[in-house]
């Protein structure tokens, strides 16, 4: 109790509670103003959608937390989001049930072993294999170009090998009369003589009747 009608006694001082006011349920206490300037504790505050937020967790015993629980809401939500992301990544490594939140309930808290599913790896890699063909075609051109430390890389012709494999696998049927392509292999001379009208037409000469192609 202060003497002199509520005035502090000589040599005394007011308590912090009577000087600053009773902490309220929200907002700054009486006699205090929340600012966005950097505090002596080396962290800043800002207003997000009307909510005061800081970039550092506030201790539970801090008067700021006691005045306004929204003071730490921004940090709390960010920490929850980071935790859920880590839960999802860790769950994907050990289980294949699809959602890690299922393990929070007792009726579906069992784990499904990923090693028992043989087709899982194939199902995961299938999109990569299909989509990788287009990327490989784009990279083949750049890979074949010369660089200061490498000569030009020429592609290997594979169509001849594929054609040989097809001929080896060919089986004559009754509709073909039991004939194969070797029965029709004859020496054909595709040489066009000098008196051919095609040559004259290409050279711009007067058109003449083309000579027939001679088959030897």
Curated annotation (Swiss-Prot):
Keywords from the named record: Early protein, Hydrolase, Protein phosphatase
Active-site residues, as the UniProt record annotates them: 95
Up-regulation conditions: VP1 and VP2 are detected 12 hours post infection, while VP3 only after 24 hours.
Pfam families given in the database record: TT_ORF2-like
EC code: 3.1.3.16, 3.1.3.48
Coiled coil region boundaries: none
Membrane-spanning residues: none
Keyword Hydrolase: yes
Task of the protein: May act as a scaffold protein in virion assembly. May also play a role in intracellular signaling during viral replication.
Protein name as annotated: Dual specificity protein phosphatase VP2
Species for this entry: Chicken anemia virus (isolate Japan 82-2) (CAV)
Lineage, broadest ranks: Viruses, Viruses incertae sedis, Anelloviridae, Gyrovirus, Gyrovirus chickenanemia
């Amino acid at each position: 109790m202060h003497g002199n009608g509520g005035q502090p006694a000589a040599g005394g001082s007011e308590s912090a509670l009577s000087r600053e006011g009773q902490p309220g349920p929200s907002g700054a206490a009486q006699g205090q103003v929340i600012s966005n300037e950097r505090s002596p504790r080396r962290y800043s505050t800002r207003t997000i959608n009307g909510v005061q937020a800081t970039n550092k967790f506030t201790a539970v015993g801090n008067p700021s937390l006691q005045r306004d629980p929204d003071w730490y809401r921004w940090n709390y939500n960010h920490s929850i989001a980071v935790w859920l992301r880590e839960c999802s990544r860790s769950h994907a490594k050990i289980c294949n049930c699809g959602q890690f939140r299922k393990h929070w309930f007792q009726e579906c808290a069992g784990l499904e072993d990923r090693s028992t599913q043989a087709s899982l790896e194939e199902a995961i890699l299938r999109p990569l294999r299909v989509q990788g063909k287009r990327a490989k075609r784009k990279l083949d051109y750049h890979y074949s170009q010369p660089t200061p430390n490498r000569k030009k890389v020429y592609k290997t012709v594979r169509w001849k090998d594929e054609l040989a494999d097809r001929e080896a696998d060919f089986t004559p049927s009754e509709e073909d009369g039991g004939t194969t392509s070797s029965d029709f292999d004859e020496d054909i001379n595709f040489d066009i003589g000098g008196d051919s009208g095609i040559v004259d037409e290409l050279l711009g000469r007067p058109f003449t009747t083309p000579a027939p192609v001679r088959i030897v």
